[in-house]
Amino acid sequence: MSHPQQRFFVAGVKQFLPSYFSGRSVIEIGSLNLNGSVREFFQDCNYLGLDVGEGPDVDLVCHGENYGGAANSTDVVISCEAMEHNPQWKKTWLNTLRLVKEDGLVVMTCATPGRRQHGTVEFNPSDSPLTIGKSQNYYRNLAACDFTDLLQHDAWFSVWGFFEDRSSHDLYFFGVGKEASEEARTQALQLHAALKDHYHKVNVLGHY
């Protein structure tokens, strides 16, 4: 489910890494358009939106952990505000890393500790209608350590980072692959520094 802080993060990634948002192959995991879609950030791309049921901006009904595309075949894999609703988020994350090219980009946003439960039978089921429709009544706020305990991200990415926005209780990730160009690595390092500074201002100085 789209919201301003999450869209700000994706826009920031695009600002610093624009080449990944035009003329590329893209897979979005959890692509249902509820109140806005990250699809609009991409231009002239071969775009495939996956979700667990039919709906706006869903191109293929498929669980993210089950999508069997070729390994190292996709320029960008993106998932926004979906992992917290996915009981198989670990397998989905591993499949994300399997799918992305060695010089590709991964972008992920999800809820982190402090966010109120949503998209369940008990709390705001309309926030995740496809999982509710599949009787998948699951929710978990995720922290960076949940992902870093799963695997060593340095094995996949030359530049990467998790960032937390405590104003919205969001967790954000971006990473560019080990074979990314020198230009992309430089841009990614600049992005990492800018995000670190921004979320220090938000989380520590209260600038939001």
Label the model's feature ranges.
Residues 1-20:
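Class I SAM-dependent methyltransferase Rossmann-like catalytic core
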Residues 15, 21-116:
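Conserved SAM-binding loop
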Residues 87-101, 105-208:
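S-adenosyl-L-methionine-dependent methyltransferase catalytic module, highlighting the catalytic core
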